[in-house]
Amino acid sequence: MPARPDAVAALPAAPGVYRFRDDGGRVLYVGRAGELRRRVSSYWGDLRNRRHLRRMMLRVAGIEALVCDSAHEAAWAERNLLERSLPPWNRIVGGLEVPVSIRLDASPEAPRLGLASAHRPAPGVRFFGPYLGARKVRLAVSGLERLYPLGHAGPTRTAGERELARLRGGRDTPVAQLASAVASVLDREPTAVADALAALTARRDAAAGTQAYEAAARLQEEIEAVEWVVAPQRVTAAGEEGDRDVTAWGDDVLVRLRIRNGRLRAWEQETCTRSVPGTRAPDGWVPFLRRNAELAARLAALPVS
């Protein structure tokens, strides 16, 4: 294998998506990483048992990357990009995770919290998401139900459901209060998120303290799942319509993201002649774009070959 290029060291230890280009500028591969530097560095490691990757790496002439605010955002960015264009070394259109939403029904008679594959408006019902990874989202719902037993709070509960609600601390809590608590977490309100994670962590530690290790492991999975669904991400927004291009530039490199109906659909980079760094985007996009324009300029100055 060729020596590990200097461009790898320029990548941050942060989640994001990356792509490799050949010397003609063609995109060879798009991937995602929980830690960009470590993941991309692995392509210059031991590939003896990965012949297809060895062939690809001989063609790589440039590295590009988008730093994301979370691993969940990176997963969505990869999925959205691969749905529109499948580079020759990618094998799966869109990715492996199944997109799902969370459905919160706060009706007093039959409140429910669960997964939904589509948004179907109904009185008293809110949808959150979409999220990637049905198993993770199901675990997040389990964790939230553990703290806020909405499904066991209606007046038509069985004796078993009433007992479960009592054990989970929701026996006398009104449905509206439980639903509001769940919505606050899923709306990513900082205090609500911190309180929910702290409560699950306390239960995990208590289970471990009594050597209930399977229960503690399950709680740890629920903690990680709640963190997944509340993680910041802007590259897939439900309900947004219309087209929008957001751009940033610096050091002769311009980064342009094309957003279509709330989803990132194209990621473009090109040289530019603007001497002063800048952005053209709504405020919520500016930090994201600025850091990625700066990274694009650093990587452009460090070709692989």
Predicted ranges, named:
Residues 1-305:
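Conserved catalytic/ligand-binding micro-motifs in nucleotide and anionic cofactor chemistry
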